[in-house]
Structures are given as structure tokens and as C-alpha cells.
């Protein structure tokens, strides 16, 4: 009888965890498929996408290394949360998190498609890239980072616990600091064109 009760409890717990674990893995898989798929496509054309830490300026180098720690470190935290079912939020909030994560996937996809071969992870040390102001960039100056933020927040709502919350907060703060550095680079590289664009479009979402 005890064995049967344990099996029923395990089965019920498994069914409760399974839908959200699957939804979360889907959201994460789509996001990283876009990221690495784009990186691989550019590599085949001789473009080095990942240029994090390639600059020698100490402040920028530090921020980009912290960005690597944040974006790489959050993945095992998310996976551990999924595997052990670490979540303290009700089902409705968790499903909302899934929708937010999917929104992040969509925003990120739109961003990398609009950037075409100008997309880089990190500030390029020597590559010549073009400023993009159309498509989703007409409504956000940093849609790729916005996609990261939405995806991270969505997964946090799916599996809300101190570990995921800490890594999510750290990642979002570091990504914001990276945005500030990239804005300086954009202003120095593209001058009046970027400044005019910055006057029209908000950093994260919306037009002025």
C-alpha cells in the first residue's frame, strides 16, 4: 500500500513537472538554436561573430568577460532548476513566463535577421559593420539584448527560485552595462547617423 502511494505521488509529481520542463526546454532550445545557428552561418562566410573580450581597454574587457560569465553561468542554473523542479510560483504565472520566453525568442530572431552579417557578440575590434535602423531596430536600439532579457525573465517565472533569480538579475545588469559600452562605440563609429537614430528610438523599446 505504501509502495503504491509512493508511486502515485511520484507519478503525480512527474506529471506536474513535465509540462513546464518541456515548455522551458523548448523556449531555451529555440533561443540557442537561433544564436548558434546564426553564428555558424556567419562562420561559414568567414565572419567571426563572437568577439567578446577582443578589445584591450580594461573597462570594456572586464564588462565583456563578466557578460560571458553571466550568459554562460545562467544556463546550468536554469537546467538545475528544471531538473529538480525548483519553482515557487503558481501555474498561471509560469505559463505567462513561457509566453514571455517565446516573445524573447521572437525578438532575438528578428534582431539577428535584421542585422544580417553585421551581427556580433561583443564589440568588434576591427570588423567594419553597418548601422541598422530598420525592421525591429526602428522600435528598439537593442532588440537582441531585449530578447535575452525577455527570455531570462520568462524562464525565471517558469522556475522561480533564489538561484535562478540571482543569475537572472546578474545577467540583466551586466547586459545593460554592455549596452552602455556599445552605445559609446556606436556614437564614436557612426557619429551623427547614430545620434539622430538615438533621438528617435528608445534604448529598449519604443519611439520618442
Where are these regions (language model features)?
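Membrane-anchoring alpha-helices and their flanking helix-loop junctions
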Residues: 2-126, 130, 154-208
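Hydrophobic, membrane-inserted alpha-helices
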Residues: 147-155
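Active-site-proximal inter-transmembrane loops
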Residues: 123-148
Amino acid at each position: 500500500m505504501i509502495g503504491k502511494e509512493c508511486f502515485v505521488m511520484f507519478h503525480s509529481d512527474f506529471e506536474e513537472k513535465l509540462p513546464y520542463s518541456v515548455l522551458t526546454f523548448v523556449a531555451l532550445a529555440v533561443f540557442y538554436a537561433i544564436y548558434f545557428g546564426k553564428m555558424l552561418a556567419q562562420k561559414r562566410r568567414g565572419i567571426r561573430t563572437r568577439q567578446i573580450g577582443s578589445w584591450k581597454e580594461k573597462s570594456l574587457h572586464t564588462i565583456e568577460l563578466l557578460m560571458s560569465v553571466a550568459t554562460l553561468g545562467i544556463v546550468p542554473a536554469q537546467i538545475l532548476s528544471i531538473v529538480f523542479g525548483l519553482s515557487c510560483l503558481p501555474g498561471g504565472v509560469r505559463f505567462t513566463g513561457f509566453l514571455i520566453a517565446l516573445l524573447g525568442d521572437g525578438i532575438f530572431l528578428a534582431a539577428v535577421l535584421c542585422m544580417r552579417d553585421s551581427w556580433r557578440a561583443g564589440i568588434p575590434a576591427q570588423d567594419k559593420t553597418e548601422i541598422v535602423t530598420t525592421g525591429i531596430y526602428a522600435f528598439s536600439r537593442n532588440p537582441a539584448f531585449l530578447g535575452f532579457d525577455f527570455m531570462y525573465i520568462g524562464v525565471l517565472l517558469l522556475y522561480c527560485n533564489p538561484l535562478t533569480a540571482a543569475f537572472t538579475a546578474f545577467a540583466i545588469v551586466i547586459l545593460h552595462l554592455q549596452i552602455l559600452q556599445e552605445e559609446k562605440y556606436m556614437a564614436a563609429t557612426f557619429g551623427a547617423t547614430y545620434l539622430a537614430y538615438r533621438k528617435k528610438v528608445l534604448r529598449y523599446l519604443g519611439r520618442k
